[in-house]
Amino acid sequence: MTNGVPALDDILERLHVVALPMRVRFRGITVRELALIDGPAGWGEFGAFVEYEPPEAAAWLSSALEAAYRPAPAALRDRVPINATVPAVSAERVPEVLARFPGARTAKVKVAEPGQSLADDVARVNAVRESVPVVRVDANGGWSVDDAVEAAAALTADGELEYLEQPCATVEELAALRARVDVPIAADESIRKAEDPLRVVRAHAADIAVLKVAPLGGVARMLDIAAQIDIPIVVSSALDSSVGIGRGLLAAAALPELRHACGLGTGGLFVDDVAEPRVPVDGCLAVEPAVPDPARLAALAAPEPRRQWWIDRVCACHALI
């Protein structure tokens, strides 16, 4: 280990690359590729999305190495409430999706999907409202300020929204929108993809901070950022496997205060996972690490060209840590 960073050869000896098929298209993908590290302290997950270049993906590798090689922080709770995650499916498919989140009292609904209309979003959100009392929406920065104002009005015509997650792309747009709508604004990409993750908070551009462990560099780094934020925090998944979900649960469990359900229920989006799928009980997940099953690792192993691509990526990111 050099300067606290494990040796590259040791990491590569412990590496497994998997391809997880998804039930529905999510973030434009139908197969989720990622690398897992079987480390001395536990399993780590490196799942930076394939379009991310090494300077951005390096934080995700740091998160994986933290999980694999360093002791975990203490948890303050043994269960974490989660939201159901509803992709940009038709309203007719909403019951099928929600069935995978038993007991969930909060749902996050994807909106502003390219190729879809605001009417599609309204129909999907209203279908969710029939089964789940608390609804939040996530636009992934897909609206302009004016579009977001229109969408907020349409999406609240038949019921309240808990918040709009990343309705616009920039901090300036979020601040402008926050002054024009009554629905709370949550920031995600404006935190995890920013050089200064605290800028959106200092700019009073958000009411809620959505924090994701892997993009921020690990649980310790996420908790450090959380300690500097004076607005409520929601811990969310970056489309993680059960291994990454375990780290998100640990981070949420280590927060002094947790007012909102967390976005850590995305395991239901996979056809298969590297460990036994986590099933919510009364809308909560137990705080415990996931240990991949060897048979599942073998069955879900990525083809050799993709394995080599991930090995090359680990090497490139390791050089930047």
Curated annotation (Swiss-Prot):
Belongs to the mandelate racemase/muconate lactonizing enzyme family. MenC type 1 subfamily. Pathway: Quinol/quinone metabolism; 1,4-dihydroxy-2-naphthoate biosynthesis; 1,4-dihydroxy-2-naphthoate from chorismate: step 4/7; Quinol/quinone metabolism; menaquinone biosynthesis. The active site is at 110 (proton donor), 212 (proton acceptor). It comes from Mycolicibacterium smegmatis (strain ATCC 700084 / mc(2)155) (Mycobacterium smegmatis). The gene is menC. Converts 2-succinyl-6-hydroxy-2,4-cyclohexadiene-1-carboxylate (SHCHC) to 2-succinylbenzoate (OSB). This is o-succinylbenzoate synthase. Its cofactor is a divalent metal cation. InterPro entries: Enolase-like_C_sf, Enolase_C-like, Mandelate_racemase_C, OSB_synthase_MenC1. Its EC number is 4.2.1.113. HAMAP family: MenC_1. The keyword Magnesium applies. CDD domains: OSBS. One of its GO terms (molecular function) is magnesium ion binding. It holds the Pfam family MR_MLE_C.
